[in-house]
């Protein structure tokens, strides 16, 4: 049974599936849809054209789909949407902005945990099973791949890609792409410290797959020489598995931009 508190303000166009619960003083704008089993606590604000999937938990005072923080965006400008998948936990005071382009969306996948005060900027992509600790701040146009874990107050520059199953220690200020499966720590810029073994275990990789990643890391980061040249040399070897190839691909792609952010190639300003 769908339950809506009488103090909630909900546009008549909003679509609520069976079992949705809307708490006191929520404001939900036009064009929003919310999937079954999703619980929306008190004082949550959901902006226009936000699509929310099943079994999510939205804690009090989070704001989803509010106007992007762009100086060049005129007062009457049209902006895009926000799509949130299933089984996400979005804690208090989280803010997630929609795309700045009317035909595009900011996208959040499934099974993610965004802790208190996390900010996700416009045009970002978060995949699945991501954990962001308190006050992580993600600038616009970033890509966060599956299984990434960002500790408290990590900051990402615009257009940064964080590869799958990476871990970033608290207070890291990340201004360039990070290949998959790695640990980074340090303030600005952080440094690669090793392989995220705990992440590999959570990913369900076999012992052989984990060993392949560890061996690739040694060849890429611990045997001297330039990282890009090491990656190109490793790419010449036969029989590399898909995980090692993903590491190599990320390194080569990020080298295509002078600051190490592959997605900068696609910016339209």
Identify what each model region corresponds to.
Residues 1-7, 12-13, 18, 55, ...:
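Terminal amphipathic alpha-helical/low-complexity segments used for targeting or macromolecular assembly
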Residues 3-190:
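Structural signal for interior beta-strand "rungs" in well-ordered beta-sheet cores
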